[in-house]
């Protein structure tokens, strides 16, 4: 009712890219635990939250546990907002020394598309239109703006993602690829994954669900 306060005790499960995990996990956890009592109002509801503990897991690797099929040997390509994390998996173990990271992820992609549209049409396209194109795939008929957007998205798959993997000496016809993260939709809709041994995990919450599952497993020990 009016004036009620939503009180909860919570555990935080969060993630870091595998390449940065060992170096940053303690400082990241300390940052999350810095303010353990939180009092705030959101959309008219007052919250009183107590953080009991926080654990840090490997980003991309967490989403892996939700992937269907035999992924005991595969290459996880986690396309997030800030980074693309490339995580080799051998016999269900993550090979940290072989992990790679790129900053040409979805935020970079959206800005690049906006710059391309402005340079060719002298007008701006909104970020929401690009995100809609990423999620829904190409629609027909296409206007002059969407034509540029679709081409940029297709080129991104070929020139940024697949070519990057080839530069790291991965044989795309022989390597099982598992695309996760919000950018997996780009590969699914514009990257012709059926031409490769590729699976696109479309649940953008897969990493978060992985953190929750891994945390619950630890709590039950």
Locations of regions flagged by a protein language model:
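Gly/Thr-rich phosphate-binding beta-strand-loop-beta motif of the actin/hexokinase/Hsp70
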Residues: 66-93, 113
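Nucleotide/phosphate-binding catalytic cleft detector across ATP-hydrolyzing
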Residues: 1-74, 94-107, 128-221
């Amino acid at each position: 009712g009016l004036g009620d306060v939503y009180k909860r005790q919570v555990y935080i499960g969060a993630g870091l890219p595998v390449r940065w995990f060992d170096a940053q996990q303690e400082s990241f956890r300390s940052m999350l635990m810095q303010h353990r009592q939180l009092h705030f109002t959101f959309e008219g509801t007052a919250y009183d939250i107590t953080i009991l503990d926080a654990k840090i897991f490997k980003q991309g690797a967490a989403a892996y546990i939700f992937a269907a099929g035999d992924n005991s040997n595969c290459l996880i390509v986690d396309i997030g907002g800030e980074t693309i994390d490339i995580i080799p998996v051998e016999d269900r173990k993550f090979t940290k020394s072989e992990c790679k990271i790129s900053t040409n992820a979805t935020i970079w992609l959206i800005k690049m598309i906006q710059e391309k549209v402005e340079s060719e049409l002298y007008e701006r396209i909104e970020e929401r239109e690009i995100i809609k194109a990423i999620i829904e795939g190409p629609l027909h008929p296409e206007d002059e703006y969407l034509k540029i957007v679709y081409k940029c998205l297709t080129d991104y798959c070929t020139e940024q993602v697949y070519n990057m993997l080839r530069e790291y000496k991965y044989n795309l016809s022989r390597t099982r690829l598992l695309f996760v993260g919000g950018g997996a939709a780009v590969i699914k809709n514009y990257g012709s994954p059926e031409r490769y041994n590729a699976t696109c995990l479309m649940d953008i919450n897969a990493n978060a669900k992985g953190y929750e599952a891994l945390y619950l497993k630890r709590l039950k020990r």
